C-alpha cells in the first residue's frame, strides 16, 4: 500500500511544484 502511495506522490509532486512556481510569478 505504502509503495503505491509513494510512487503516486512522486508523480504528483512535480506537477504541484510547477503550480506553486506559477503562482509565485
UniProtKB/Swiss-Prot annotation:
InterPro entries per record: Antimicrobial_4 (IPR012523)
Transmembrane annotation, as ranges: none
Organism in which the protein naturally occurs: Centruroides suffusus (Durango bark scorpion)
Keyword Secreted: yes
Tissue spec: Expressed by the venom gland.
Job description of the protein: Amphipathic peptide that shows antibacterial activity against E.coli (MIC=12.5 ug/ml) and S.aureus (MIC=12.5 ug/ml). Has hemolytic activity against human erythrocytes (25 uM provokes 83% of hemolysis). May act by disrupting the integrity of the bacterial cell membrane. Increases efficacy of antibiotics (ethambutol, pyrazinamide, isoniazid, rifampicin) when tested against S.aureus, probably by facilitating their incorporation into the bacteria.
Name of the protein described by the UniProt record: Css54
GO terms for cellular component: extracellular region; membrane; other organism cell membrane
Any single GO BP term: killing of cells of another organism
Entry keywords, A to Z: Antibiotic, Antimicrobial, Cytolysis, Hemolysis, Membrane, Secreted, Target cell membrane, Target membrane
Similarity field: Belongs to the non-disulfide-bridged peptide (NDBP) superfamily. Medium-length antimicrobial peptide (group 3) family.
Keyword Membrane: yes
Subcellular location: Secreted; Target cell membrane
Amino acid at each position: 500500500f505504502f509503495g503505491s502511495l509513494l510512487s503516486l506522490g512522486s508523480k504528483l509532486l512535480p506537477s504541484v511544484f510547477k503550480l506553486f512556481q506559477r503562482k509565485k510569478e
